[in-house]
Amino acid sequence: MRGCLQLGRWLSAAPRCQAASLRPPTVFPSYRYNRSFSTTTIYYGRSKTTPTKLDLDLEKRIAAIPIERFRNFCIVAHVDHGKSTLSDRLLELTGTIEAGTNKQVLDKLDVERERGITVKAQTCTMIYNYKGEDYLLHLVDTPGHVDFRAEVSRSYASCGGAILLVDASQGVQAQTVANFYLAFAQGLELIPILNKVDLPSSDPERALEQIKNTFEIDTDKAVMVSAKTGLNVPAVLPTVVEKVPAPIGDSTKPLRMLLVDSWYDSYKGVILLVRVFDGEVRAGQQLISFVTGLKYFVGEVGIMYPTETAQTVLRAGQVGYIYFNPGMKRSKEAKIGDTFTRVGYEKVVEPLPGFEEPKSMVFVAVYPVNADLFEHLEDSINQLVLNDRSITVQKESSEALGAGFRMGFLGTLHCSVFEDRLRQEHGASIIITPPSVPVKVVWKSGAEEIITNPAKFPDDDSVRLKVAEVQEPFVLVTLTFPEEYLGKVIELCEANRGEQQSIEYFTATQVIMKYELPLAHLVDDFFGKLKGGTKGYASLDYEESAWRAGNIVRLQLLVNREPVDAVTRIMHSSQVSRQGRIWVTKFKEHVDRQLFEIIIQAAVGKKIIARETIKPYRKDVLAKLHASDVSRRRKLLEKQKEGRKRLRAVGNVVIEHKAFQAFLAK
């Protein structure tokens, strides 16, 4: 009877429940379900057994388009030249999104919208009708900043052409040059487009001259647009259709699919962005990874339109997403550049070459503010690293700050963006050390070792005798700026141990200059000083150059002659004196007074570079004495003095977590 009542309540409540939340009551016997796959799409929070009419119409249109009418392209530009705004206009033009209400649709991260920059390469599929025929266009909005070069390089692998976008008011900038050569090296068809031609400060003729002289590109058919107002934007897509070649692929061959990117979804798990080179992929198929050898069943396939839109199939030439059911158990299984094929064809299909692993150039240590939150921080880092494989992570421990991570990034902006994402997307409260660069130790035995953690630097006299030399990384920096700031830029580069490589004028008033600089100086706010010295008109790009021998030392902070491991850096000897004085002065501000004297020192080996002293609290031991009792007065003062000596010898300085947090804050 009780079971019937429960069943009656459940049936009466069923119409008010969402379809996906329906569950049989516990009084029902358990059944064995046949695990078979279908192309039915499961949406979390609701059930969708049949596609909507809009989805069916979209799928029919895509199915009718042959690979010869596919176009995969990206937008190449310097940061802030209008890539994301132009992407919005193209999406509106093709009816992918509604017009008038969008701003940087493909900038999906909070940090991207706050900073006004693109951090992650985002993709979107569009259908464009040209001369009575549908074309399937796949657009990639790439980052412009040098720190996200790995994102740009991966994006180019899925494209056949690129829009070379140049701000008509600023002209060719440093990262325009760098991104151009990256696209040119991959054989992409380049289409020059001038943006912001509606601005009063725009000079299209000068910008076209710079493009022609710098890149040797025919600018006669360059398109001049204003992405903000939509001026002449309809002329862009016909140029893309005519100039960008169709992708090469065969849907009848066995599946050959490249993993381009991945991200984490709290419901679906790891989602993969893929480019299908041959064959086709559907829900229910079993795939195998060439890198790991692991097998997975496909749960769903689809395209970004501009959000995840499920499809029945992805064909050769398409770029889309897939996720597995059951999903990947560990985020590390998603190897960027991996090739997937169907189980049984792994000996027939040749794996694709993949991508070159980017090298970390800047390292920081990250610790949770509260030691109890270490596991939460670890989970948060793993989820973000899944979406950015250029980051390296190693666990480490500090006596002062507890368990944490040593993390490597491609640059200081890359590090700063990751820090913002940790705080905003995962609510992490963290302490992060200032960025440092790796050094190479060449031993007298001939062996070489890359040191990324200052704690492992050979500083002891006995170990130092075995070292032949210590080398630091140099980078080749490309600077573009107006001619009037030439003197200030040269002065800044020379002050940072730079060596001039070349200087040329690509117009009468614009200079391109190349310098070799130590990477350690570049990450020490060099770009901020450059912007300040040129009133914001200079731009910068850099690439790896070489390792050079130098007088590299380890600077440590000592508190009562005990080293504080959380405040240690490897640097050139020329920086030591200035940095040491900054450290001791700043650290003194954040350490509480004790009953004994606290000595704060900056040291290189046994040599003290700078010192500050925090005086102890003073206790008036003479308060109860008569003024005439001189011998008693002297005896009590001597006793107090001896007591302070003992305290200083055995007393442990208590430095609170918040002191480190304040000291390490930017």
Curated annotation (Swiss-Prot):
**Enzyme Commission identifier(s):** 3.6.5.-
What would you give as a GO molecular function for this chain, any one? GTP binding
Query: What reaction(s) does this enzyme catalyze?
Result: GTP + H2O = GDP + phosphate + H(+)
Q: Which Gene3D superfamilies does the protein's record reference?
A: 3.30.70.240, Elongation factor 4, C-terminal domain, Elongation Factor G (Translational Gtpase), domain 3, P-loop containing nucleotide triphosphate hydrolases, Translation factors
The tr-type G domain covers which part of the protein?
68-248
Q: What is this protein called?
A: Translation factor guf1, mitochondrial
Lineage start:
Eukaryota, Fungi, Dikarya, Ascomycota, Pezizomycotina
Look up and give the organism this protein is from.
Penicillium rubens (strain ATCC 28089 / DSM 1075 / NRRL 1951 / Wisconsin 54-1255) (Penicillium chrysogenum)
Instruction: Return one Gene Ontology term, BP aspect.
Output: positive regulation of translation
Subcellular localization: Mitochondrion inner membrane
Instruction: Enumerate the residues binding GTP.
Output: 77-84, 141-145, 195-198
HAMAP family (alphabetical): LepA
- Output the PROSITE patterns linked to this UniProt entry: G_TR_1, G_TR_2
Gene that this sequence comes from: guf1
One GO CC annotation, please? Answer: mitochondrial matrix
What is this protein's function per UniProt?
Promotes mitochondrial protein synthesis. May act as a fidelity factor of the translation reaction, by catalyzing a one-codon backward translocation of tRNAs on improperly translocated ribosomes. Binds to mitochondrial ribosomes in a GTP-dependent manner.
Membrane topology category: Peripheral membrane protein
